[in-house]
Amino acid sequence: MKYLHTICLLFIFVARGNSRSCDFCHNIGKECDGYEKECSSPEDVCGKVLLEISSASLSVRTVHKNCFSSSVCKLEQFDVNIGHHSYIRGRINCCEKEQCEDRPFPGLPLSQPNGYYCPGALGLFTEDSTEFEAICKGTETKCINIVGHRHEDFPGDISYNLKGCISSCPLLSLSNATHEENRNYLEKVECKDAFQLARL
């Protein structure tokens, strides 16, 4: 249930979205039905986000439809190894029309540890989360660190912190993050080379 609760809140990771109307809904699974809402600046496109959190044999997916900032759409997808055999994956598709096509989730590759590691963490409602060692695998040679907060009418202010191994640095930075009247704010976006494990 902890992972289920976590993934349902992860839509805060992407900004919500001038006078365009988009579908708005959240649900567990691959599809959701909601209502149409009018977007406010700087959110200028409709979007659909699929999120997945995988831990060992357990995998849970959620879908989120909303208004988005086109700058956040540049992220397109992310696969973060947060350690303890757990991954957080997202597929973001923005479109001019109401029905956005899905970006599929390929199966996780059966990759072996590659001799690198990163700090791993997943924190919600806090910017300071307990770190542990995430052992990088396959092509994962970068460390990602994202810290921010978002204000929602419910449940209110939500802080978040995501750290782990990633294959390449995403096109997401403080310069193209949206600052919508303090609704969504990225405090830190870091992507650097992973650390090499000590050889025995």
From Swiss-Prot:
The keyword Disulfide bond applies. Expressed by the liver. Disulfide bonds join C22-C46, C25-C32, C39-C67, C73-C94, C95-C100, C118-C143, C136-C165. GO terms for cellular component: extracellular region. Keywords: Disulfide bond, Glycoprotein, Phospholipase A2 inhibitor, Secreted, Signal. One of its GO terms (molecular function) is phospholipase A2 inhibitor activity. It comes from the Eukaryota. It holds the Pfam family UPAR_LY6. Residues 1-19 form the signal peptide. N-glycosylated. The glycosidic chain may contain superficial sialic acid residues. Glycans are attached at N176. Its main location: secreted. Belongs to the CNF-like-inhibitor family. Inhibits the enzymatic activity of basic phospholipase A2. Specifically neutralizes PLA2, myotoxic, edema-forming, cytolytic, and anti-coagulant activities, as well as intracerebral lethal effect of the basic myotoxin I from the same venom (AC P0DQP6), crotoxin heterodimer and crotoxin subunit B alone. Does not block the enzymatic activity of crude acidic PLA2 fractions from the same venom. PANTHER family: LY6/PLAUR DOMAIN-CONTAINING PROTEIN 8 (PTHR20914), LY6_PLAUR DOMAIN CONTAINING 9 (PTHR20914:SF30). Homomer of 110 kDa composed of 20-25-kDa subunits. This is Phospholipase A2 inhibitor CgMIP-I.
